[in-house]
């Protein structure tokens, strides 16, 4: 009963491990909740200190509970490679191989949906850019749209992308999304109509799709952003990267496991789609993901 109001929930699949210094630890799965005791980040691997006296029972964290912060003696720290905050889509800088999707030069944390059509993705046609060609499959179908994304890892974050839309033609859409499932995602979408670009919010909840506000864009570039403050996702757009307009805000709980099921959590990514086959495309200059860890 001590855990019922804890931010950490859904614990299971635990293993007890003894470290080289004879200290004991528990590795398990669990998820972090927020205001509504719901979670959007899927099940994560967690580590907790264990006291195990000879002849006694193991006790986790002194009282049998897990917290986001648990004071304890730690093992020697080992530096780990970190993904850059800003992905600039230059596989040459990383000496990565570009023959297959998983080695496009993106960190291994990037992913697509189902079996991607590799011809819709390129890092070589324009150096330093990720070129996305639209699919006639859209985000709300159970198939493989043109889509690349990474996991949401904190409740407080900002995800921003700079898109070159000079080859976005009418009938196409491109954007950034907080994606939980085909019928549950929050998007910032750019469309071209009569030669002009417009950004809008699209909220997909089950069989309902809703757009609240539209923003005319100047020029052929757009800065698209989704942020979260633990309770809401905010969908934003800008022509200059400095002055952002909030197009909509939606509660994060509508993308949570408790609302829609599943256990893998929200992805933050880029997509393009079209009503018909087209020669248009979108070039992504960079994608930036910044997080703030808060208690």
Write out the residue ranges for each language-model feature.
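Carbohydrate-active catalytic/glycan-binding domains of CAZyme proteins
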Residues: 1-295
């Amino acid at each position: 009963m001590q855990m019922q109001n804890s931010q950490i929930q859904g614990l299971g699949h635990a293993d007890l491990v003894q470290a080289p210094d004879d200290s004991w630890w528990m590795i398990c799965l669990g998820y972090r909740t927020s205001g509504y005791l719901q979670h959007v980040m899927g099940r994560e691997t967690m580590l907790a200190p264990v006291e195990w006296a000879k002849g006694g029972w193991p006790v986790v964290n002194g009282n049998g509970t897990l917290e986001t912060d648990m004071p304890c003696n730690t093992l020697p720290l080992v530096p780990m490679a970190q993904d850059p905050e800003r992905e600039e889509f230059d596989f040459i800088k990383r000496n990565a191989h570009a023959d297959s999707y998983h080695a496009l030069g993106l960190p291994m944390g990037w992913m697509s949906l189902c079996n991607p059509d590799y011809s819709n993705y390129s890092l070589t046609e324009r150096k330093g850019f990720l070129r996305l060609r639209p699919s006639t499959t859209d985000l709300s179908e159970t198939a493989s749209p043109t889509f690349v994304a990474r996991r949401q890892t904190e409740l407080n974050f900002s995800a921003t992308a700079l898109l070159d839309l000079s080859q976005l033609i009418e009938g196409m859409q491109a954007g950034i999304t907080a994606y939980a499932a085909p019928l549950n995602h929050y998007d910032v979408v750019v469309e071209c109509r009569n030669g002009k670009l417009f950004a809008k919010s699209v909220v997909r909840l089950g069989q309902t799709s809703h757009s609240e506000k539209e923003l005319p864009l100047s020029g052929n570039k757009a800065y698209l952003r989704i942020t979260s403050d633990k309770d809401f996702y905010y969908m934003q757009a800008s022509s200059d990267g400095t002055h952002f307009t909030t197009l909509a805000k939606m509660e994060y709980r509508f993308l949570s496991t408790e609302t829609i099921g599943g256990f893998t959590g929200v992805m933050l990514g880029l997509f393009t789609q079209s009503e018909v086959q087209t020669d248009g495309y979108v070039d992504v200059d960079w994608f930036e993901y910044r997080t703030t860890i808060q208690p």
